[in-house]
Amino acid sequence: MVFLDSIDFSGMNYPNFEGLQLLPLDDIILVADDSHGIGIVGENGSGVYQKLKSFKPKELIVCCSLGKGYGVQGGAVFGFTERIKTLQKTAFFGGASPAAPVGLATFLDSEEIYTQKRVILKNNIKLFIDGLKRLNRFVYMPKHPSFSYAEEASSNHLEKNKILITNFRYPNEDSDLLSRIIISAAHKKEDIQCLVRHLNTLSEN
């Protein structure tokens, strides 16, 4: 049995999963957390399930939060029919709280909106990448909106200019600083250009 995060922010897994493909997957139950992929990557935001299924593991289970890509307070589990039926019979499943009906109703009725937002997100990611003078300072994955880096001076500069990013020490206060820029569909063209301009200014210094 192998457990993994589909999006590990280092590029080791998604999109090609090179290391995973070296394993004897026909003998392995593969369990993947796709919380950072569902709604963003894959055809129509379907995540990595079909990609991982194409590797033909002995069994595939994909779980995810719907809160990141879809903004729904709930979760999902995808897998082979027999496994899902088995999970449905457990006390863990029976005692779990479902997503709020209003959230699920909105989710089901919003396919067109999600599609439009993914197009905007794709364009925003391209605008960000194309505008940077030093893209190699970032660790990122194709078509994914997260860009990690290790320059504390950049984080300080952005904060001073009222640009907020993910920036904290994890998993404890003695750990290395985790800095990550997340592009979203809510960002306007001017937002991306402003961010790029500040990052490029740092590159020149």
Residue positions per predicted region:
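Active-site phosphate-binding strand-loop segment of PLP-dependent enzymes
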Residues: 1-32
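Catalytic P-loop NTPase motifs of RecA-like helicase/translocase cores
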Residues: 10, 37-39
